[in-house]
């Protein structure tokens, strides 16, 4: 696992979930976080490759890193900009 991913303060396992569940879970998790905290999302739904970056842009969060070449996909987001 990339050092960036392993340093996440929170983790969300969305394996086996299909759209729209992963993004709904991300939204719920982020709401409980403080600004500046990080969340590692692990997912295997191909729709997350589009949905999570769009969610970050729409909700003004930062997508720090992503790994979408093979499953499980990994996304590291920071709450807020």
Swiss-Prot record:
The active site is at residue 19. Keywords: Cytoplasm. PROSITE patterns: UPF0033 (PS01148). The keyword RNA-binding does not apply. One of its GO terms (cellular component) is cytoplasm. One of its GO terms (molecular function) is sulfur carrier activity. The keyword Disulfide bond does not apply. InterPro entries: Sulphur_carrier_TusA, TusA-like, TusA-like_sf. GO terms for biological process: tRNA wobble position uridine thiolation. It comes from the Bacteria. It is found in: Cytoplasm. Sulfur carrier protein which probably makes part of a sulfur-relay system. Belongs to the sulfur carrier protein TusA family. NCBIfam families: PRK00299.1. This is Sulfur carrier protein TusA. It comes from Shewanella halifaxensis (strain HAW-EB4). The lineage of its organism: Bacteria, Pseudomonadati, Pseudomonadota, Gammaproteobacteria, Alteromonadales.
């Amino acid at each position: 696992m990339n050092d960036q991913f392993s340093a996440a303060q929170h983790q969300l396992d969305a394996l086996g979930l299909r759209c729209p569940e992963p993004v709904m879970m991300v939204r719920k998790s982020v709401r409980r976080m403080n600004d500046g905290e990080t969340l590692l999302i692990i997912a295997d739904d191909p729709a997350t490759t589009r949905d999570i970056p769009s969610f970050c842009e729409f909700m003004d969060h930062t997508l720090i890193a992503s790994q979408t070449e093979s499953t499980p996909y990994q996304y590291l987001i920071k709450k807020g900009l």
